[in-house]
Amino acid sequence: MLKIKTNEISFNIKDYVHLIMGSKKIGKSTLFSEIGRIECGLDKTLCISMGDEDGHQVLKGLPYVNPKNWDEFHEFIHDMVTHPENYPFELVSIDTIDVMVDMAIDKVLKEHLIKYKEPCKSINDAFGGYGRGKEAVCRLISNEIETIKQSKYGLFLIGHNKVRPQEDKDGIDIIVKENTKKVFSKTQKTVA
């Protein structure tokens, strides 16, 4: 027989994954920086600025790293979680999830090329088609998000809203980049 439990709500900001979405240059990175400054101090707030994202550049005092591809991102996350004593941060942002998705797609396309010795036309054609490429992208992203969630760090995901309307799980209309929508619709339980 199942035991009835009472749900407890946490008021610790690190216990949730936060999603900040908005138009370019509206202040998403600034919002994360200010939340970090108030909650734990800027010295304990880290921005993972993906690829060519530059929102962190106008935020004085905000620590950041700038992985240029999926392998650099993965290696950094692995090191940060494996050796937390070297990373005194409490809050971490991935800025932006749009670039993270693009990096994951590039990684999957390279893996396809290595395995099949020929390029595929799109992510949909990777690994024989039928959504296998998208599934591989979702796995890569979900694994990294879960790794961070299971660690000591609070996680903020920052993204751009654009291109296509989508309704989130609470019925709120948002607009997201098509590739980001495809990936995060599969991992919505992770995003919170």
Q: How would you label these PLM feature ranges?
A:
Residues 67-74, 91, 127, 131-142, ...:
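Amphipathic alpha-helical transducer elements in NTP-driven molecular machines
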Residues 105-136:
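A solvent-exposed, charged loop/short amphipathic helix patch at secondary-structure junctions
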Residues 102-107, 142, 167-169:
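Short, conserved acidic/polar surface loops in the N-terminal third of protein domains
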Residues 15-21, 59-65, 124-133, 171-176:
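Short, basic, glycine/proline-bearing loop/turn elements
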Residues 140-151:
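Catalytic-core regions built around general acid/base machinery
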Residues 2-94, 98-106:
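Conserved P-loop
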Residues 6, 147, 154-192:
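Phosphate-binding/switch region of NTP-binding enzymes
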